Amino acid sequence: MERSLSFEPYLLTPLDHIIKDFYVSSFISFPLHDPTTAVSALKDGVERLTRALPFLSGARVPSSKLPGKRNVMEIHPSPESLEWIPMLQIKHYRDTTLVATCSPGPTGCSDLDDSWCALPIIIPADRPSPVARFRASVFPDGILLCMTLNHAVFDGSGLGTVLKMLATCCCANSAMDHPVSLPTTYAKEASSRQIILESAAPSSGSDSEAYDRIFKSNDIIPGLDKGITSRRFSFPASKIRALKDACNAAKPTDQDPAISRNDVLTALLTICMTRARQTEQTKNLTTQLAVPVNLRRKFHPSLPDSYLGNTIIPLVVDIDPPTVPSSRCGTSPMHAHLNELTNLSLRIRKELKLLDEKDYTGGLVSYLREQSDWGATSMKFTDITVSSLRHLDINGLDFGPEIGRANSFDVQSGMYPGICDIMPTCGRDRVEDINDVPWDVCVTLEDSAWSAFMEDDLVLWALEKI
């Protein structure tokens, strides 16, 4: 199948252009008695998916379709990229096992580095930039499937949709030329891109200043010169629910918007990470938090949840240096920090509510389209970024009788310190209520900050260690 599949090249939207050109890898494990049969089913599944959506086999290349604009990119058929790396790579490992490879280490994270990925995080400029690639690492006891996507083409929701479509294609038992029913098509994707472009509306000067604050990138990835480690935590749902209830009860007025569980967990992680990283030189400095927000339902008409392209923007919040609460005998860490947690959670929620204004997305798209250099306006790197993948519903995904259900899901660890990923829900089959599923989080920090983070009384409380 490594011949080039034809499709009409298409321009990436302004929202795709604000994401830097790097790759995101996700991993799904399948314990198996007969991996050989599963490999054949996986090959067929990838081929069905690529036939249905041939642009997945394409590459991101410069475009000349917008005269007067610089650094505009499009997706184009790319036989050379398929010659370089096929859509599905298969590697066999007979001297180790799936269990050993995927077992969490002392940090709670699997040691899945670039050597297990279909593509590296950054591809050299003289190489093609493929849209998507897959890699199956085959062990005597199962398969580790890696899907690597170009983040300048897909966001987190798009990642989840591609994985679900691959599962559907692996389940299909029809002839290869028989169409598979998928939630999106080339035509539907084109329609969604058109909705984004047609949403553009004039933005005010104050709006432009707000957009400048979000998108004027510093082009410097912070902390790459420092040793970093990623750790995975599982916060009991009861703790996050208690924190949400306490923060909502502590709101200054009844008119304030309701605070969500995602809001309070983001606030908790941000406060504890900021304290852990604090030094004598930084203790009085403001910290910037970015929360990527999905805009699919903010457009008019709204985009389908199955749209694959980027619709995320960073909600940026400036955070004052953390305070040292006055400790009182018998006061839990949650109540000792309640004012700070409530204030930050409420600020996050109020910023999110601003995105509901009807003209927000139109002004945003207009601002991005008006830029003369589409490559110069991208998300800035902030001190802390908290992304949520909890809604993806990937764990337990059924890939058919030969491959089985997804046993575990993981993402490649953060590429720089300050990244937090709230992972998709897992263990839903072990609880009666989705609200009782723990909140799994992967945190990446400088090695020098981990001791303080692990000893923070708020972290210990949230993990039920005190």
Curated annotation (Swiss-Prot):
Q: Which GO terms describe its molecular function?
A: acyltransferase activity
Signal sequence range: none
E.C. no: 2.3.1.-
Q: What domain of life does the UniProt record list for this protein's source?
A: Eukaryota
User: Which pathway?
Assistant: Alkaloid biosynthesis
Sorted alphabetically, the keyword list is: Acyltransferase, Transferase
What does the record note as the disruption phenotype of the gene behind this chain?
Abolishes the biosynthesis of communesins A and B and leads to the accumulation of communesin I, a non-acylated version of communesins A and B.
InterPro entries named in the record: CAT-like_dom_sf (IPR023213), Sec_Metabolite_Acyltrans (IPR051283)
Per the similarity annotation, which family is this? Answer: Belongs to the fumigaclavine B O-acetyltransferase family.
Q: Which PANTHER family match?
A: FAMILY REGULATORY PROTEIN, PUTATIVE (AFU_ORTHOLOGUE AFUA_3G14730)-RELATED, TRICHOTHECENE 3-O-ACETYLTRANSFERASE
Query: This chain belongs to which protein, by name?
Result: Communesin N16 acyltransferase cnsK
> Which organism is this protein's natural source?
Penicillium expansum
